[in-house]
From Swiss-Prot:
<dbReference type="GO" id="GO:0005524">
    <property type="term" value="F:ATP binding"/>
</dbReference>
<dbReference type="GO" id="GO:0006421">
    <property type="term" value="P:asparaginyl-tRNA aminoacylation"/>
</dbReference>
<dbReference type="InterPro" id="IPR002312">
    <property type="entry name" value="Asp/Asn-tRNA-synth_IIb"/>
</dbReference>
<dbReference type="InterPro" id="IPR004364">
    <property type="entry name" value="Aa-tRNA-synt_II"/>
</dbReference>
<dbReference type="InterPro" id="IPR045864">
    <property type="entry name" value="aa-tRNA-synth_II/BPL/LPL"/>
</dbReference>
<keyword id="KW-0436">Ligase</keyword>
<protein>
    <recommendedName>
        <fullName>Asparagine--tRNA ligase</fullName>
        <ecNumber>6.1.1.22</ecNumber>
    </recommendedName>
</protein>
<dbReference type="GO" id="GO:0005737">
    <property type="term" value="C:cytoplasm"/>
</dbReference>
<dbReference type="GO" id="GO:0003676">
    <property type="term" value="F:nucleic acid binding"/>
</dbReference>
<keyword id="KW-0963">Cytoplasm</keyword>
<comment type="subunit">
    <text>Homodimer.</text>
</comment>
<dbReference type="InterPro" id="IPR006195">
    <property type="entry name" value="aa-tRNA-synth_II"/>
</dbReference>
<dbReference type="InterPro" id="IPR012340">
    <property type="entry name" value="NA-bd_OB-fold"/>
</dbReference>
<keyword id="KW-0547">Nucleotide-binding</keyword>
<dbReference type="GO" id="GO:0004816">
    <property type="term" value="F:asparagine-tRNA ligase activity"/>
</dbReference>
<keyword id="KW-0648">Protein biosynthesis</keyword>
<dbReference type="InterPro" id="IPR004365">
    <property type="entry name" value="NA-bd_OB_tRNA"/>
</dbReference>
Length: 445
């Protein structure tokens, strides 16, 4: 029976067989050290010349990096070894021969080289750990919404209009007769689903033609977007908090090995796992930022010449970074000026200058991970907002239909998966949070 590396701790003192790839090797004299991976984890194997047939030892010496092999040996406890165990090899045989030299050697490589070799780099410890965390979070997303009674609802990738009223769209020529766009969001269609099922969520790729080279932006990323009808602004924020704290708890429960492999300080995630996220208004957030700037109490990656935000302007990345360092867990900033938010957001009945919306800012400078709002449910108000933004009414006629019949207050939000993965994993750039990033300067491999 073939064992896997992740379960070797359960077989200490037993003889097992592994099928694995060689990531690196070293040795001298009568011993060879083989570093192995099999997709489930990493382990070191030792081949002692006196314990094996001569051909086995010679075969071990001939192995090349990333060669696939089958090994049989005894699992031994060793606190010094990664994972607390190592394999003492008795038999070994290559599964196949390599036909080229593996380009990613154990020496240091620059990030651009590694991204050029992304199809191979995924085999290495760092991306392996990040992708395992991504898988864990994706499963947790589905589990959370299932436990809350949501229906998964698939929105189209082709749309005839810009849901956010922006020009950052990938245009598609439909057989020379009409134009369509790659979807920026599944929200509008999810609202239709909410009126049918009460609670729905979409989860899939999203496309934004942003000519940005920042560490927070991708042209193609994954987004989860729940919509609830009926619902309101406060209930929407409560849902966001339950959701994010659930994801962090799941990652801490299931991915300790991967997080420690990345050198992640797990204590930084404990507050997020507990919930109780602070909630401040946009106006209060501006004051927090202003005080930090005046006192020169700035995070290391924020330049000293950063300027305060004037009321009515959006928060920039440096301001979000300041707020993220001010709190020890995600902070929810609510009631932004309506003029800088999307047309479909419900105005605050107590102050029409602001919308019933919020952004969730991750700590440690990771910035916005969620944007949400109560949606306009009144037909006349929504129509006037569409016209005010200069958007074509005919493109939104079906969306207005949702307000013509059976409209109720409803709310939802969008969460960028890769931003959450970057934050939980503690990585600097969002490009590492997706298997094959698509950016302004990268379309391959």
């Amino acid at each position: 029976m073939i064992s896997n590396i992740r379960d070797l701790k359960q077989h200490v003192g037993e003889t097992v067989t592994l099928q694995a790839w060689l990531t690196d090797k070293s040795g001298k004299g009568k011993i060879q050290f083989l570093k192995l991976r099999d997709g489930s984890g990493f382990v070191q194997a030792t081949v002692f010349k006196n314990d094996v047939e001569e051909e086995v030892f010679e075969s071990a010496k001939r192995l090349t990096q990333e060669q696939a092999l089958t090994l049989t040996g005894e699992v031994r406890a060793d606190e010094r070894a990664p994972g607390g165990v190592e394999l003492s090899v008795r038999r070994l045989s290559p599964i196949s021969e390599n036909h080229a030299e593996y380009p990613i050697t154990p020496k240091e490589h620059g990030i651009e080289f590694l991204m050029d070799q992304r199809h191979l780099w995924l085999r290495h410890r760092r991306p392996w750990a990040i992708m395992r965390i991504r898988d864990c979070v994706q499963r947790a997303i589905v589990d959370f919404f299932h436990s809350e009674g949501f229906v998964r609802f698939d929105a189209p990738f082709f749309t005839p209009n810009a849901a956010e009223g922006t020009t950052e769209l990938f245009e598609i020529d439909l057989f020379g007769e009409d134009k369509a766009y790659l979807s920026q969001t599944g929200q509008l269609h999810a609202e239709a689903g909410a009126f049918a099922f009460g609670k729905v969520y979409t989860f899939g790729p999203t496309f934004r033609a942003e000519k940005s080279k920042t560490r927070r932006h991708l042209l193609e990323f994954w987004m989860v977007e729940p919509e609830v009808a009926p619902s309101n602004h406060k209930q929407n924020m409560d849902l966001q908090e339950r959701f994010v704290s659930f994801l962090v708890r799941r990652a801490l429960d299931e991915c300790t090995v991967e997080l420690e492999m990345l050198g992640r300080d797990l204590s930084k995630l404990k507050g997020a796992a507990e919930g109780n996220y602070p909630r401040v208004t946009y106006t209060e957030a501006l004051e927090i930022v202003r005080q930090h700037i005046e006192n020169k109490d700035l995070p290391p990656n924020v330049q000293e010449d950063v300027q305060p935000v004037e009321w009515g302007d959006d928060l920039g990345a440096p301001h979000e970074t300041i707020l993220g360092h001010h709190f020890d867990r995600p902070v929810m900033i609510e009631k932004y000026p309506a003029a800088i938010k999307a047309f479909y957001m419900q105005p605050d009945p107590e102050d029409s200058r602001v919308a019933l919306c919020d952004d969730m800012i991750a700590p440690e400078g990771y910035g916005e991970i969620i944007g949400g709002s109560e949606r306009i449910h009144d037909y006349d108000l929504l129509k006037s907002r569409i016209e005010h933004e200069g958007l074509p009414l005919e493109a939104f006629d079906w969306y207005l239909d949702l307000r013509r019949v059976g409209s109720v207050p409803h709310a939802g939000f969008g969460m960028g998966l890769e931003r959450v993965i970057a934050w939980i994993s503690g990585i600097d750039h969002i490009r590492e949070a997706i298997p094959f990033p698509r950016m302004l300067t990268r379309m391959r491999p």
